[in-house]
Amino acid sequence: MLQRFFATALAIFVVLLGGCSATSGLQAYVDSYDGYEFLYPRGWVQVQVEDPVDVVFHDIIETTENVSVVVNTVASTKSLEELGSPEEVGDRLLRNIIAPSESGRSSALIAATSQKADDKTYYILEYAVTLPGDGNTAQQRHNLSSIAVSRGKVYTLSVSAPEERWPKVEDQFKTIVSSFTVY
């Protein structure tokens, strides 16, 4: 009787502990054609997009929270390091893509780091973006991106949320970004 109680308690503990993993509540997205994969939250829905955006998922309740992957062909670039340091790539991304001067958006690079996984270099960028609007309607957003080069293409996975939601989603979004793999 006592053994059965401990066995049952242990089984319940293992099941509950498994739900506490960093990837709980996430599911895999695999694009074997373009050669990348990542985790995204269960219950998020895929949105129709146009090139160069390859895929977008967003929350069905907090629709402004999203994850996207952009794939661009790059002539003669064999490695991410050839594009510059993490800070240089981050500055160019913000200046030319995220918040070009004519867009009315502003941006600030918060952090830029480099990490290696499976012989690939990934630049991890954290940045803030202010969308246009007057003082009351301008929206502050918080973003994380992972950038990698593989097979003559630059892959950029980005997650984004309103700044006021960032503390709630930060850990999950960091897990999503770190799950991004190109091959």
From Swiss-Prot:
User: What does the record's miscellaneous section state?
Assistant: Crystallizes with Zn(2+), but it is not known if this is physiologically relevant.
Residues with a covalently attached lipid (S-diacylglycerol cysteine): C20
Q: Which organism is it from?
A: Thermosynechococcus vestitus (strain NIES-2133 / IAM M-273 / BP-1)
Requisite cofactors: Zn(2+)
> What's this protein's name?
CyanoP
Q: What is its main location?
A: membrane
Q: How does it sit in the membrane?
A: Lipid-anchor
Lipid-carrying residues in chain (N-palmitoyl cysteine): C20
The record's Pfam families line, in alphabetical order, gives:
PsbP
